[in-house]
Amino acid sequence: MSLASVFNIAGSGMSAQTTRLNTVASNIANAETVSSSIDQTYRARHPVFATMFQGGQSGGSDSLFQNQDAAGQGVQVLGVVEDQSNLEARYEPNHPAANEKGYVYYPNVNVVEEMADMISASRSFQTNAEMMNTAKKIGRASCRERVYGEC
C-alpha cells in the first residue's frame, strides 16, 4: 500500500465523518421542532456508508464476503436516509402548533444517542487525521533517507 493510498483512505474517512457530524448537528438542531402534522414533522436523518474497493467497486457488507481479496480503498457516503420510526404525538391543545384534535408531533430524535454519535464521529475523524499525519511523517523520513542517507 502506497502513502497516496493511505492519504486517500484517511481523506475519505474524514469526509464521511464530516457528513456524519453535519447530520448529527442537523438532528440535534431540529430535536425540539414541532408540527401539527406527521408529514411536516422533522425525522432524524442518518448517513449510509459503503466501502470503496480497488477498481471502483463499492458496496455494503454483502460485497465484503463476495470478494475477500479486494483491498479497501476508503469509504463513501451513499446517501442520507430518514429514520422511519414513530414520531412522538403529544396532546397539547393549547400549543400554537396543535392540530384540530389538539395534537403536536415531535421528531424521532434521541438527543442522548445523537450526542454519543457525535462523540464517536469526532473521534473517528481525529483517528483519520492522525493516520494522515503519521503517513506524512513516514513520507518525510523516507525522503530524508533517500536524499541524505539518514536513518
Listing of model-derived features with the role each one plays in the protein:
Residues 1-144:
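Amphipathic alpha-helical polymerization modules
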